[in-house]
Amino acid sequence: MVADFVAQTGCDLLAVAVGNVHGLDIEPKVDLPLLEQISKISPVPLVMHGGSGIPFDIIQKAREFNLLKVNYGSDLRKAFVSTFGQAYEANHNACSVIELSIEAVENVSEKAAELVTIINS
């Protein structure tokens, strides 16, 4: 089924659902044996959506099974939004949206760099 799907769609990457979940409200339970089985029959590298909340040792193990890309949207959104929350808590009256937006983008960039470093280690 995997090889047929790739052949029929011509996709370059295949996003898989192996216990990964979107958001941070549900604990992911990644099925590494299933990921390994899929990797053996997939002619293209694999992608995992819902990477936020998955322990890095699981991600590193998953990379052994042709996992090329992991999406961390919730972690990056959390880094962005927490900037505003922390600033508001620190000083309710002195919140410059422009300055906070710049700081939020910097925080997202730092978080993204951290995730890339961990994944590539």
Question: Whereabouts are the PLM-identified features?
Answer:
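Active-site mouth loops of central-metabolism enzymes
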Residues: M1, V47-H49, S101-E103
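Glycine-rich beta-to-alpha transition loops that act as phosphate-gripper elements at the mouths
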Residues: P45-F56
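Short hydrophobic alpha-helical runs that function as membrane-insertion/retention elements
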Residues: V47, K69-Y72
